[in-house]
Amino acid sequence: MLDRCLLLGLASAAAIAPPALAQQTGKPLLKRASTSTLEIAYEESGPATGVPVLLMHGFPYDPRCYDEVVPPLVAAGYRAIVPYLRGYGETRFLAASTPRSGQQAALGQDLLDLMDALGLPNAALVGFDWGGRAACIVAALWPERVRCLVSANGYNIQDIAGSVRPAPPEQEHRLWYQYYFHTERGRAGLAANRHALCKLLWQLWSPNWRFDDATFERSAASFDNPDFVEVVIQSYRHRYGYAPGDPALEAIEQRLAARPPITVPSIVLQGEGDGVATATRADTQAHLFTGPYQRRLIPRIGHDVPQEAPQETAAAVLELLRGGG
């Protein structure tokens, strides 16, 4: 299987900026890799022979959230790969018939498929929000492919069967956008006002982060992907059982319904100022991490942990890769 993966990685089509230009600008290379369902755009930095680190963004964010995390990893000799999730940036579906699903199994399968396309037997995984969900899924279901895991916001695998249980009213209030997306008005609102709506979520979820308009706009361009709205709407409906999933992914969803533990060395980062996934002093998810595990609370940091706390994020990755987990 791995020999096949290596061949796929070598054969994978890539649209790449000239190396000399990339060195002059200091920008990561933008490449593309084909899987069975997607052409995944991703940014790559560091030596091709370095241990790979895949860094996965969330909703509504994009690879810019890792701009200050990547340099210390590259300086330490690691190969940093930052994909655009399905529905974001230059990532595209290969076939019109493929369901525009944002369900958790799709995100996990996309990450695994990307590793196969790049010929990576294993990698360190980093993620938050949707990207943390993808990373947690691969770590839980295919631990042999994962060297270590840094997950912001905790054990990100959804408990879909438990979604019918109401949360405390204050938390229900924080999840207003999810219930909005359950309606056709919400779909229309996201389509018509995607930048304004996503900027509001940034502000609500990271109340202590004083980002400027230019910072937001650098990421907001990724939301103009033609499949962004459909992928987002399906994601937030599926997790409550209000939309069917992709039949091709049902076997993965059944495995995830069992709440599989994560056995690989892991560090969870949680912002104490997160306006949507509120942090508690008690670690209610520790039992879901059965390998070497730490949880770190970061004062004043909101939901976008890697962009708001890049030093802490990079330090956690380096600690695990150097055997400190």
Segments from the language model and where they lie:
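N-terminal export signals
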Residues: 5-22
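Flexible "cap/lid" subdomain of the alpha/beta-hydrolase fold that forms the substrate-access gate
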Residues: 23-28, 39-40, 52, 88-126, ...
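Short acidic-hydrophobic surface loop/beta-edge motif
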Residues: 29-35
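A short loop-to-beta-strand scaffold at the N-terminal edge of the catalytic core in hydrolase folds
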Residues: 36-44
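Conserved HGGG/HGGXW glycine-rich cap/lid loop of the alpha/beta-hydrolase fold
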Residues: 45-93
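Residue-level recognition of beta-strand->loop/alpha-helix junctions
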Residues: 84, 297-299
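Catalytic histidine-centered segment of alpha/beta-hydrolase-like enzymes
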Residues: 301-309
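C-terminal alpha-helix
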Residues: 316-324
